[in-house]
Structure formats: structure tokens, C-alpha cells
Amino acid sequence: MSDDRLGLGRERRFLVLLGIICLALIGGALYMQVVLGEAPCPLCILQRYALLLIALFAFIGAAMSSRRGVTVMETLVVICALAGAGVAGHHVYTQFYPSVSCGIDVLQPIVDSLPLAKIFPLGFQVDGFCSTPYPPILGLSLAQWALVAFVLTVILVPLGVVRNRKKTY
């Protein structure tokens, strides 16, 4: 097996792992919503969309056979992770300064009109306020954990590309 195919294989395995992790994070959010009664706010739902898109692009990228196709999907993964980091960062800011709410009356109709809110309302329909504090997990709020996950994705995907595609002479 050539070095080129080996590097692409590593990237594919990493993309599959990333997709599984994103789906697990969405599953964890649904568990907290349904079992623990933590109502999702508009920013929570937008973060779920970002995680879902990252998983989708990661799985598509893992199925691609060409280097160019994998690169395009990895680029889309990073773009979605940047968007998710922006939303999570705003969510963290809103939780630190509760007087600056996300405005459920402004974002709720927009988020609730997105297609998945109609198809799968349990997972993608707004129910709460962004400034509502929930118990932290290992010292961090859910928004902070989401921010960590998105930032790690933005850093690790390009690092994996550079590492796996480095030419040896």
C-alpha cells in the first residue's frame, strides 16, 4: 500500500471517529433533554445542527475515494465547526452575562422553521432560554463543552491533513 493511500486511510478513519463522536454528542444532548428535563434553547439547537452537519460531512468524506473529495469534505467539516464555535462562544457569553439573552422571541421562530424542527421536533425544536443555567459537567457548562469540541475539531482536522499528507523525500 502506498504512503498516499495509507495517509488517506488514516484521514478516513479519523473522519468516521469524528462523525461518531458528533452523533454521540447529539445523543447526549437528547438524553439531557428527555431524561433530565433540560430544555434546549435556540443556540443549543443551532449547535446540534452544526454537530449533525459535521457528522454528515465526515461520513461522506470517509466514503470518498479521491483525495480531492476527502479534502472538500474536511473543509466543510472545518467550516461547520467554525460556525458551531461561533454559536457556542455566543452561548457561553450569554450564560456569563444573563442580562444579554439570546432573545427566544427573535431566534425561536427562525430555528423552529428549519426543516429538521418539523421532521424531528423532539431533537430540533426550541423549548428554553439561552441564559438558563444548568448544572455543570466536570466544571464546565454544556455550552463550554460544545465550544471545546468545536475548537478541537477546527484544530485537529487540519493537523491531521498536514500530518497524513506530508511528503517524505
From Swiss-Prot:
Physiological role: Required for disulfide bond formation in some periplasmic proteins. Acts by oxidizing the DsbA protein.
Gene3D superfamilies, per database record: DsbB-like (1.20.1550.10)
Record InterPro entries: DiS_bond_form_DsbB/BdbC, Disulphide_bond_form_DsbB, DsbB, DsbB-like_sf
Disulfide bonds: C41-C44, C102-C130
Family per record: Belongs to the DsbB family.
Record's protein name: Disulfide bond formation protein B 1
A cellular component annotation (GO) from this entry: plasma membrane
Pfam families named among the record's database cross-references: DsbB
Membrane topology: Multi-pass membrane protein
Keywords from the UniProt entry: Cell inner membrane, Cell membrane, Chaperone, Disulfide bond, Electron transport, Membrane, Oxidoreductase, Redox-active center, Transmembrane, Transmembrane helix, Transport
Subcellular location field: Cell inner membrane
Ranges facing Periplasmic side: 32-49, 90-144
One example GO MF annotation: electron transfer activity
NCBIfam families: PRK02110.1
Transmembrane is among the record's keywords: yes
Main subcellular location: membrane
Topology, Cytoplasmic side: 1-14, 65-71, 164-169
Keyword Cell membrane: yes
GO biological process: protein folding
Membrane-traversing stretches: 15-31, 50-64, 72-89, 145-163
